[in-house]
């Protein structure tokens, strides 16, 4: 790994993390449901699907941009660990149905948004 790749990852990941921090801070928790985490994971999933859709349709995205946007920005924007902790917290608080809704919603929505981004990019 060279210095250019490291810089792209640091900058992309940092911008993604700042975006996640801002979005999560602006959005309130909706009736104990961690909506901010769902939104940042959804945005990252859609963007990553869109990037790969462009690649599969023959759009030329340089390896540097793929690293910056995909691994860096989308990696910094999304957060599996926060999703896991929030689900654990809901379970610990006895909110079994909210925990189940959090798991189901995050997984189904993010997979669908990868698919949607992929399809929209290929049009």
UniProtKB/Swiss-Prot annotation:
GO terms for cellular component: plasma membrane. It is found in: Cell membrane. NCBIfam families: crcB. Disulfide bonds: none annotated. Fluoride-specific ion channel. Important for reducing fluoride concentration in the cell, thus reducing its toxicity. This is Fluoride-specific ion channel FluC. Na(+) binds at residues 75, 78. It is a multi-pass membrane protein. It comes from Pyrococcus horikoshii (strain ATCC 700860 / DSM 12428 / JCM 9974 / NBRC 100139 / OT-3).
